[in-house]
Amino acid sequence: MVKRNVHLTKLQSGYLFPEINRRKNEFLKKHPSAQLINLGIGDTTQPIPLYISEAMQNFAKQLASEKTYRGYGTEQGSILLREAIAEQYYQGKIDPQEVFVSDGSKCDVGRLQILFGSDATIAVQNPTYPAYVDTGVINGQASFFQTSTKQYQRITYMSCLPENNFFPDLANLPKTDLIYFCSPNNPTGSAATNEQLRELVQFAKKRQSIIIFDAAYASFVRSSHIPRSIYEIEGAKEVAIEVGSFSKMIGFTGVRLGWSVVPKQLRFEDGHSVQQDWERIVCTFFNGASNIAQAGGLAALQKEGLQAIDELSSYYMKNSNILKKAFEECGYKVYGGENVPYLWVHFPQLTSWEAFEILLKQSQLVSVPGSGFGSAGEGFLRFSAFGKQSDITVALPRIKHALLKIKPTVY
């Protein structure tokens, strides 16, 4: 028989969200009439704006005609969409040839691991989006999991806590080849300032590292001092790859469309172009994003589409403001929720799973345990504001009922 991939054996038994679903379904079996409200997984709930969905519909209709049918597109993506991303999203700071359209930023995160190989060392924020770690493990960039620390050997974990404003102490970090950094951040809801990102870019230059910058939630940024892209920082093109996503921006979580930016200036240790190798990987592993999805993405970056993006972002951020106020009124410390619709709530007397179970059983609310994002997430829950406002309104009295019962001690 064929031996199992040894790297897959290193993965922990349950990915975070399947475990949440298991506990949720177990609760529903015991309480079939319960009306659960999901404030956990960050899936969108508002429909794709009509202007954008009509663009996809019109493209799909063209596929039914011999005159207008189109098959394979280019692996790198439609040049019209690449130009629109470069112009509208990056204000011309990025060359369209540096943009690679994909089926989502999560897929790009996995393929980027292949670009750098199993010998590459990686650093991740702690807490962090699980895909950065798990794709690294699968690709052989980690050793075995240590139960005592709840961390993988060979991976550097950058502690991001309220005490350091969710920005790591870079001076005390060892050199790694890759630095994964997400801002605005999932799960903590924090967003790095211009000053912090300048420090990160300078650190990467000094250590000769490459930053993988996840900007999936950039469309929600409201503060003028918060960059939407790493390329707003001088010198970032020399040390950073950025991934972006249409998923939360226009409700494309089920459509699947994203992009990566690999600047021409980015080089390997031997001077070879990173972009050239990335293009080879894209062309080898990927046949290009759906033409229909790309038609929607192109529409989203026109005047009417950009207005729809702003309206959608405002809708979810209003939810975030409502939820944040409710938690704070009950005496809880709440982080995030200002530049991304995620709230990071501290439960100082409980473990993350204990807090999860209390809210599930007492208030029929589903959240995400912070410990699932890393050891630094213990004692926190992540709440998503991507729900419907009607559900948020119904959830408020339930939240207050449960929280007041477990009201925290003075911080």
Swiss-Prot record:
Binding positions for substrate per the UniProt entry: Y15, G42, K106, Y129, N186, N287, R382
Cofactors named for this entry: pyridoxal 5'-phosphate
Stated family: Belongs to the class-I pyridoxal-phosphate-dependent aminotransferase family. LL-diaminopimelate aminotransferase subfamily.
Annotated GO MF terms: L,L-diaminopimelate aminotransferase activity; pyridoxal phosphate binding
Protein name as annotated: LL-diaminopimelate aminotransferase
Signal peptide interval: none
Pathway: Amino-acid biosynthesis; L-lysine biosynthesis via DAP pathway; LL-2,6-diaminopimelate from (S)-tetrahydrodipicolinate (aminotransferase route): step 1/1
Organism lineage: Bacteria, Pseudomonadati, Chlamydiota, Chlamydiia, Parachlamydiales
Species for this entry: Protochlamydia amoebophila (strain UWE25)
InterPro entries, per the entry: Aminotransferase_I/II_large, DapL/ALD1, PyrdxlP-dep_Trfase, PyrdxlP-dep_Trfase_major, PyrdxlP-dep_Trfase_small
GO BP annotations, alphabetical order: lysine biosynthetic process via diaminopimelate, diaminopimelate-aminotransferase pathway
Gene3D superfamilies: Aspartate Aminotransferase, domain 1, Type I PLP-dependent aspartate aminotransferase-like (Major domain)
Catalytic activity: (2S,6S)-2,6-diaminopimelate + 2-oxoglutarate = (S)-2,3,4,5-tetrahydrodipicolinate + L-glutamate + H2O + H(+)
Domain of life: Bacteria
Keywords carried by this UniProt record: Aminotransferase, Pyridoxal phosphate, Transferase
